[in-house]
Amino acid sequence: MKQERRRKRQPGPPRLELVVAHPREEEMAGLDGGGDAEEGATHARGGGGAPPPWREQLTARGLVASLAVGAMYSVIVMKLNLTTGLVPTLNVSAALIAFVVLRGWTQALARLGFAARPFTRQENTVVQTCAVACYSIAVGGGFGSYLLGLNKRTYEMAGEDTEGNVPGSYKEPGIAWMTGFLLAVSFVGLLALVPLRKVMIIDYKLTYPSGTATAVLINGFHTPHGDAMAKQQVNGFTKYFAMSFFWSFFQWFYSGGDNCGFSQFPTFGLKAWQQTFFFDFSLTYVGAGMICSHLVNLSLLLGAILSWGVMWPLISDLKGDWYSADIPESSMKSLQGYKAFICVALILGDGLYNFVKIVALTIKNLFDSSKLKNAKKGEDMPVLDELHRNEVFTTDNIPSWLAFSGYLGLTFIAVIAIPMMFHEMKWYYVVIAYLLAPALGFCNAYGAGLTDINMAYNYGKIALFILAAWAGKDSGVVAGLVGCGLVKSLVSISADLMHDFKTGHLTLTSPRSMIIAQAIGTVMGCVISPLTFFLFYSAFDIGNPEGYWKAPYALVYRNMAILGVEGFSALPQHCLQLCYGFFGFAVAANLTRDLCPPKYGRWVPLPMAMGVPFLVGASFAIDMCIGSLIVFTWHIIDKSKAALMVPAVASGLICGDGLWIFPASLLALAKISPPMCMAFRSTN
């Protein structure tokens, strides 16, 4: 019975992290209202002994495992960032891989006759936290968006004659300055809300659904029944990892040229292929489609049909009328401008609506909780298990003086270092950002605890527009992009830390070991992510709108900064009217979903997801929908087996295909080309 209960609470595939993440209905339904999830965590605890001291939760083998898992996922998410810009949350997958690595290590030592330290849920939690902190830098460090938007190629793509895109307003990527920038901005968020952790987790009892889901998964692993369950998942992961890796290896032999290989297979005919409608055999995106909700995947497909199936062919027919026929379609004054700015309109409409909604919800819940606290004072007595969790959570305190002094010290370093890297970024911009960071971080962390939506990218976009307009024409683009990264990093890490604290609270893990693991993982990420980025940047044609490595959000963010400087004068002819329409559609779609009954509202497409294919193309949306179709069919055939195995199989597909990128990039750097080109042409 207990095993069945745990299986029902097994976290569903995690949500897709778009610029604003939308929580999955399936995930929220199983985790809403912390009581049931916490009960599941308690039942899974089993044994009931005292947790090990915080120093024993941080182990050398755990840090090595964190480094391996974090580095592997950094490569995977960097590939996703530089192709479509869409990265699914991989926390559940990381927890599974951490368990696989360390359980395999302890079992191997036992077979060799060596006594190994027991592998506890606390160590598993610390390893997962450290690994996620490491690859989160690759996800949110701006390598496919605001930092890449600073390079010369994106500057040229935005139009050298575009108003606001002034000559010299670019900075080529460099390992040294990127590492320094990440180190300067990534740690302050760790310290901003440490003194409020008890308030957020214990007093307000915020659910943090992703953190709770990870805790339930980890607790489930560390039970007698969990071993059998984990063994099935490990076998599924290993099988599909190997299949995905060798399929990618096989494809490489046929990709020796432009538009060659299985990734350019005209599945629906050459006419559809010209409009990017084909299946490109990318198992990474098939796996991502298995993790993401059906609504996200269908929204992607709808956006692809609307843009590449209808709008772009129609606008192309107006060449010479709406825009000059003498300029290439890649110019921002041509078709590319419509693609970029309409995508921006959808992103801004969706982001602004969700920003206002979450802030309003946060204020309302803070007000309601303060009234309930006074009304119910003394009525509810915590159960024994909750008291035990609370005691562990408050035992190993992080001194407030250390958090405050660390925050001030890091602020001082950033105020000096960031203007030295970017002369357009004045020191007082940095001071203002760091003064506002605790308040913004609290709002974001509180909203994430209620809804599982991390609004950091929207705070960053608001900072981008404000700083771009404030800095003016000569410095606005660079100041806006850098300020966006600064605010986004400060706000995002605070919410991530609270998710981790929730996981630690439910697995009886010391908060001191959690924050140390987060700090170590952040250091790893600040070093590994720039190195990983440069591996891709040196080996592949990053930012080519006609190639595989489009990195679409670099151009999107630069165009946002240009809009902040110049306003609507930067738009091509009739583009403003289209942008108004799509901005209004994004707001209306969100309102409809929130106001309609759930059985109708859940079918309303997500504007953020619809906007991504506008720049990237339709092929990856088809991959994602194939992943959705696999999950849908599997649930019809065997629902309980699908709930158990989908995360493991999807992780195997993503990791196998993603890991092949490492040898492929080394072959490209060594100037070793594939021996064959498989291409298709019409018989006419």
Curated annotation (Swiss-Prot):
A biological process from GO: seed development
Name used for this protein in its record: Probable metal-nicotianamine transporter YSL9
Family the UniProt entry places it in: Belongs to the YSL (TC 2.A.67.2) family.
Compositional bias annotation for Basic residues: 1-10
Compartment(s) of residence: Membrane
GO CC entries: plasma membrane
Residue spans crossing the bilayer: 58-78, 82-102, 130-150, 174-194, 234-254, 295-315, 341-361, 402-422, 430-450, 462-482, 515-535, 568-588, 612-632, 642-662
UniProt-annotated stretches for the region Disordered: 1-55
Xref: InterPro entries: OPT, YSL-like
Tagged with keyword Magnesium: no
GO molecular function annotations of the record: iron-nicotianamine transmembrane transporter activity; oligopeptide transmembrane transporter activity
Lipid bilayer topology: Multi-pass membrane protein
